[in-house]
């Protein structure tokens, strides 16, 4: 029996190029004892804490595999609760970045979280429609509240009462009594999803945001308080209501459930609406910690800021209004007006301050009000930017001023092409708006150059220049020392889909959507602005084809050129004469990527039909077809000096294969969305990949050998554990699903723990039987048994 081939394991080395994931939220945290100086944002599975003043990353809260979805800082500012895509919640210390507590209860992504006033309890809502209350101090789940029919969008503790209010995509707002753990009131006045909620005016009012441009305002009156204080002035009870609002209230009250038995805790009635300027749905609606400022935004780039008057300010305004009304009455020499007619409108109590216009679509925000009356707002934008604004509320006309912007460490759009320099040190990444050069060891961005929509790229031999092919058919040549664009050439009439450097390094070849393959040579031309000559490129030959060209590759000896066409075939031509040599057909959809091995014997093709085919370059025969990914194969590249190759797929996975044994070696999992491209370093030690999740990931080859049988066994175990965790709870005859339940969920750990308990009970029973037998024997022998 021969020795099995030894493979080396690739492991994740770093995540970079990402400032904040648009799928998570932003939360202001304290840095160096200063509140509002730091901002925590979800970054794929990790959480990054940025110093807004310096624009630096100061802390990474490392996650496991699942994407971070929701962040909630504790009231003391020392901890951060992070909810993940799989429903788990981890509580991190902001002092050392360690995860102290893990809660497992939800079956789907966490969508909302909030601490109570003291930070002892945490409530979480999820896409699985459940709400769970957790005991942070005892590190355990208290109970699960069931009632929503769709994802929970917001959860709020009431500070004074032991009550909870939750909203969901099922259009319902539910009130829960946490003493009895049941829902005692359901607001059904909304016709669309309730996307956000906020409690204002010392928890006497509730504001809800839905799919339209109205923010609905509801008055909360606690029944016990009304019984205690029957002499409450009428003006206080009816403040802010208007004839229009009263009509709305009547309409909405008819929609409310008949809950007369449960009206003993509180009443909730609609008093009117605040109109937003945005026409689309509310994405985030929140107040600052003091409850004085309300802000909301939709799916656009505008944050609307409102000021909420306190009880004292409302009273003062009401008195002023009464005085004015009396003066008017005297002037008209009429009888005195009754005071009850004077009341404040809702717009006077909740006043629009200003709008903050961000540079791109807002995905999340957080804000903090300083004692001096200055509002600090931080925005997480869709295009991988974090912006902070300052708003002086004491000014006559408050205007938002941008205080800081964190953007240099990432691209604004998806990276579509990557390349390694010949010395394995520099990494090129290019997107729709810029080309960035990164230092591989420090992961710092050392150059940023504006470009058009980039599709392909490479380092020019010598690593002093780079060439980028664009969607508009241009070739752009950049000088790295100066970071400037040296030359732009209109190369193709359509997109430049592929570019390949010739093995002799004297030129390169491009393939485009204009059905042409063009051959280029490097040349030195005189520069008018300099004495020295500069690098340029000239077209030397052209190969016209019948279909769009998607990918081009040279064989290592430069004798053959492989061209992938839109008709799902790969044509092989002789480079010198451009005569046709072979046609590789068999893919059902176009070949998006391909590569030729270092010895020129094999060509591997990856297609949109999810398959990878390995062909011999001598006769064009297909050695093997491999089902590689669950979606299109986007990129394929051989490891230097070997027949091993990597593929990247739209399913978010990167896989390594053996082209001789036709075996899958390992899967590099980390990206949460489609992987667009990857690049291997010339020495094969590093892999860099780019994804739709805006992250760039670096993978490193270790010296650790990888045994295929062990890998398969580990994969089977992981699949089994996942299937066990997904199994539903057993249905017991005659038992109905209650409104509350246990907070935990079945995982492989809980199953193992239950089995250990069962084993211990079994052992105890066996030992008790033995003890009884021993006692009986001793009794028969007349011996005394101690204990």
What is each stretch, according to the model?
Residues 14-45:
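Beta-strand-rich domains and repeat architectures in extracellular enzymes and scaffolds
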Residues 28-36, 71-77, 113-120, 155-162, ...:
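Loop/turn segments within WD40 beta-propeller blades
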Residues 47-51, 89-92, 131-135, 173-176, ...:
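WD40-repeat beta-propellers
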Residues 2-6, 15, 193, 213-293, ...:
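Terminal intrinsically disordered, low-complexity extensions flanking WD-repeat/beta-propeller proteins
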Residues 13, 58-59, 98-101, 140-143, ...:
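A structural motif specific to WD40 beta-propellers
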Residues 42-43, 83-86, 125-128, 166-170, ...:
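Conserved strand-to-loop turn within each blade of WD40 beta-propeller repeats
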Residues 174-201, 628, 632-694:
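Ankyrin-repeat and related helical/solenoid repeat scaffolds used for protein-protein interactions
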Residues 16-24, 62-68, 104-110, 146-152, ...:
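WD40/WD-repeat beta-propeller blade N-cap
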């Amino acid at each position: 029996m021969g020795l099995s081939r030894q493979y080396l394991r690739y492991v994740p080395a770093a995540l970079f190029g990402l400032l904040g994931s648009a799928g998570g939220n932003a939360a202001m945290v304290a840095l160096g004892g200063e509140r509002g100086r730091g901002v925590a944002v979800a970054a794929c599975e990790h959480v990054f804490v940025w110093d807004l003043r310096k624009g630096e990353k100061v802390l990474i809260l490392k996650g496991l595999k699942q994407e971070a979805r929701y962040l909630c800082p504790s009231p003391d500012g020392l901890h951060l609760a992070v909810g993940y895509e799989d429903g788990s919640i981890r509580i991190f210390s902001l002092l050392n970045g360690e995860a102290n507590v893990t809660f497992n209860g939800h079956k789907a992504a966490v969508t909302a979280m909030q601490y109570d006033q003291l930070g002892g309890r945490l409530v979480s809502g999820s896409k699985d429609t459940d709400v769970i209350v957790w005991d942070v101090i005892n590190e355990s789940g208290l109970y699960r509240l069931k009632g929503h029919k769709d994802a929970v969008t917001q959860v709020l503790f009431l500070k004074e009462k032991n009550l909870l209010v939750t909203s969901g995509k099922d259009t319902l707002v539910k009130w829960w009594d946490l003493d009895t753990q049941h829902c005692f009131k359901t607001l059904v006045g909304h016709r669309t999803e309730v996307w956000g909620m906020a409690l204002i005016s010392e928890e006497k009012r509730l504001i809800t945001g839905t799919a339209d441009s109205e923010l609905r305002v509801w008055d909360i009156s606690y029944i016990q308080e009304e019984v205690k204080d029957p002499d409450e002035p009428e003006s206080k009870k009816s403040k802010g209501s208007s004839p229009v609002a009263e009509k709305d209230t009547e309409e909405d009250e008819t929609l409310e459930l008949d809950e007369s038995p449960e009206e003993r805790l509180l009443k909730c009635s609609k008093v009117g609406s605040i109109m937003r300027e945005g026409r689309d749905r509310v994405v985030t609606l929140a107040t600052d910690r003091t409850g004085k400022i309300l802000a909301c935004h939709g799916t656009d780039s505008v944050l609307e800021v409102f000021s909420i008057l306190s009880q004292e300010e409302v009273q003062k305004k009401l008195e002023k209004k009464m005085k004015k009304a009396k003066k008017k009455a005297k002037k008209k020499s009429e009888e005195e007006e009754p005071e009850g007619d004077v009341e404040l409108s809702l717009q006077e109590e909740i006043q629009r301050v200003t709008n903050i216009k961000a540079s791109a679509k807002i995905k999340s925000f957080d804000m903090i009000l300083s004692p001096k009356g200055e509002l600090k707002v931080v925005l997480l934008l869709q295009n991988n930017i974090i912006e902070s604004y300052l708003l002086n509320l004491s000014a006559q006309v408050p205007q938002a001023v941008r205080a800081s912007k964190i953007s240099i460490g990432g691209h604004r759009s998806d990276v579509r092409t990557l390349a390694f320099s010949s010395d394995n040190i520099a990494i090129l990444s290019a997107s729709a708006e810029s080309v960035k050069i990164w230092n591989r060891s420090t992961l710092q961005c050392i150059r940023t150059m504006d470009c058009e929509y980039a599709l392909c790229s490479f380092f020019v031999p010598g690593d002093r220049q780079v060439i980028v092919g664009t969607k508009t058919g241009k070739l752009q040549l950049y000088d790295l020392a100066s970071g400037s664009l040296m030359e732009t050439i209109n190369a193709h009439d359509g997109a430049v889909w592929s570019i390949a450097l010739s093995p002799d390094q004297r030129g390169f070849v491009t393939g485009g959507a204009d059905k042409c393959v063009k051959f280029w040579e490097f040349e030195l031309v005189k520069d008018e602005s300099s004495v020295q000559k500069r690098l340029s490129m000239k077209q030397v030959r052209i190969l016209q084809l019948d279909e769009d060209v998607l990918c081009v590759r040279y064989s290592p000896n430069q004798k053959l050129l492989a061209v992938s066409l839109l008709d799902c075939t790969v044509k092989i031509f002789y480079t010198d004469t451009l005569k046709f040599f072979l046609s590789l057909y068999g893919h059902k959809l176009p070949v998006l990527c391909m590569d030729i091995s270092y010895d020129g014997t094999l060509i591997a093709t990856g297609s949109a039909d999810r398959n990878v085919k390995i062909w011999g370059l001598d006769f064009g025969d297909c050695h093997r077809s491999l089902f590689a990914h669950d979606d299109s194969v986007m990129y394929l590249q051989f490891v230097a000096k070997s027949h091993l190759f990597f593929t990247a797929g739209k399913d978010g996975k990167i896989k390594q294969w053996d082209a001789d044994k036709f075996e899958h070696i390992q899967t590099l999992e980390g990206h949460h969305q489609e992987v667009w491209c990857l690049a291997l370093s010339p020495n094969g030690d590093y892999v860099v990949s780019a994804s739709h999740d805006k992250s760039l990931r670096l993978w490193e080859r270790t010296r650790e050998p990888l045994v295929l049988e062990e890998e398969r066994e580990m994969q089977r175990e992981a699949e089994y554990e996942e299937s066990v965790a997904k199994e539903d709870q057993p249905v017991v005859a005659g038992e109905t699903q209650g409104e509350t339940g246990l907070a935990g969920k079945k995982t492989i750990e809980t199953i193992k723990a239950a089995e250990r308990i069962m084993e211990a009970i079994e052992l105890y029973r066996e030992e008790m039987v033995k003890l009884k037998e021993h006692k009986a024997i001793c009794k028969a022998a007349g011996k005394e048994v101690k204990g």
